[in-house]
């Protein structure tokens, strides 16, 4: 769900095209963006051929993909992908160039949260995440004058003293909220969709006199685990419809399909 939701929120044309016109396989698309030359060497002419002709690069890109989607910097991606920081930065540059909508959303989100001290999670509901000590961070940012940095380089850099710790915490906080400005929006909107679906489902259960007959056992990320008697055979289709309609309230550019699976146990 998060990838489709991200495509809508970022209004990233490459992601939207892949979901609407392509295979919908983001691993293929990421591999094509990052390892295009390697994929072409194996006979791929487009992203849709990666899974069949270059599965090793589809597998290899996953560590880069997940870290990038969460807004990770080059050192983190290097650690995840087991490559040099320089190579990780090349991956980031390739993805920023390929996913222009996502990159622009991240840039604007970073500027907004640094200026205003909060992130708009979902414009449809007004949910926000606040940078709790943003006023302190902003004042400290103003104090970092050219004179401060000159003194820092001469007397503090590399000493591990209190000033070094203040500088470290300052930039660490900025990096955290830069990542949140992209990640919290998709994750948060996904959570709102799930809550909307669960509310609708609960009301349907009550309205149809299934209270204490159908049970909502667990919600994990974008999955709902329910217990119901086999006599209510159409319940899986009803649940799919409820979840898809909940997603459609918040994801306007493309559908987010739901798929029910029935069994005697559940494994996430």
Model-derived features with residue positions:
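Conserved catalytic core of nucleotide polymerization and phosphodiester-bond processing enzymes
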Residues: 1-268
């Amino acid at each position: 769900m998060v990838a489709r939701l991200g495509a809508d929120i970022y209004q990233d044309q490459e992601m939207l095209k892949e979901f609407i016109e392509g295979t919908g396989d983001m691993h293929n698309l990421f591999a094509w963006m990052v390892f295009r030359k390697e994929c072409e060497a194996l006979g791929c002419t487009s992203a849709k051929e990666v899974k069949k002709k270059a599965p090793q690069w589809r597998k290899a890109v996953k560590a880069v993909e997940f870290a990038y989607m969460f807004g990770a910097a080059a050192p983190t991606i290097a650690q995840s992908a087991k490559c040099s920081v320089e190579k990780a930065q090349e991956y980031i540059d390739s993805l920023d160039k390929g996913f222009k909508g996502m990159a622009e959303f991240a840039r604007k989100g970073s500027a907004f949260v640094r200026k205003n001290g909060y992130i708009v999670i979902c414009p449809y509901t007004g949910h926000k995440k606040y940078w709790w000590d943003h006023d302190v961070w902003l004042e400290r940012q103003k104090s970092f004058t050219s004179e401060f940095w000159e003194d820092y380089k001469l007397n503090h850099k590399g000493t591990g003293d209190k000033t070094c710790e203040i500088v470290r915490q300052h930039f660490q906080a900025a990096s955290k909220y830069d990542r949140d400005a992209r990640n919290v929006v998709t994750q948060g909107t996904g959570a709102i969709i799930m809550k909307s679906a669960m509310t609708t489902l609960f009301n349907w259960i009550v309205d149809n006199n299934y209270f204490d007959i159908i049970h909502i056992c667990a919600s994990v990320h974008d999955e709902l685990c329910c217990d119901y008697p086999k006599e209510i055979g159409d319940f899986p289709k009803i649940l799919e419809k409820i979840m898809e309609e909940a997603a459609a309230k918040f994801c306007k550019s493309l559908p987010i399909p739901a798929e029910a699976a029935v069994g005697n146990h559940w494994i996430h």
